Amino acid sequence: MTPSFLIFLVGLLYVVIFWSLSLLRRERLSNQFAYEGLGLTGIMFSAVRWGGVGVHPIYFLVLLYLITMRVRLLVELGNMLSKWGRYHQALAVYRLALHLFPDRSSRLIALINMGAAYLEQAKPERTIEVLENAKAQIVRQLGPKYAAGCCYNLGMAYRRTGRYAHALRQFSEVDDIYPLSGYARLAEKARKATLEETGMTMFVPKEEDAERF
């Protein structure tokens, strides 16, 4: 097996595997990801086959991963900074990710995490601004986990700004999108707390009733 063919095989398998993972997560396939992966594979294949360049397949795989996953890697870095309470730096990293020509899915994931960081920074209005505009695309493009997370954070932002009707609507959508999940449990807890805050306790089911279902 020639080095150039190994490069081609590694690149092709990389794209196919990641596309398969997107299908398993019920996300829409990213054409940009495929174009970038196959384009880089074609360039490296040509360089090895006709340019006399020697590249180990493992090094090529690492390079391919870093380039095609650049936005998601930055999002993970931003998430780490956010967990450490360094929200300003986390938001700067998310903004950088959005300027690196992300594909649609990666862009939406960056926006979801940016909205969460604003919420943790006690800036719910900014969370609403970021997530409300992106919500429809998130529901269509990404899997139920991301869509539920978006609705939950949006609901919490509405609750903190006193827009309780909007908050309750978002919490209800979480259960519709991703039932029996951690987000659904959090949303139900937040929904009950919101009803109690607004004095609508008659809509909160009793524990005995809840246990029957």
Model-predicted segments: where are they?
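Residue signature of alpha-solenoid helical repeat architecture, marking inter-repeat boundaries
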Residues: 68, 105-107, 144-145, 185
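Transmembrane alpha-helices and immediately adjacent membrane-cytoplasm interface residues
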Residues: 43-77, 81-83
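"A position-specific structural signal for the A-helix of alpha-solenoid helical repeats
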Residues: 76, 113, 146, 152-153, ...
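Amphipathic alpha-helical segments of tetratricopeptide repeats
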Residues: 95-99, 132-139, 173-177
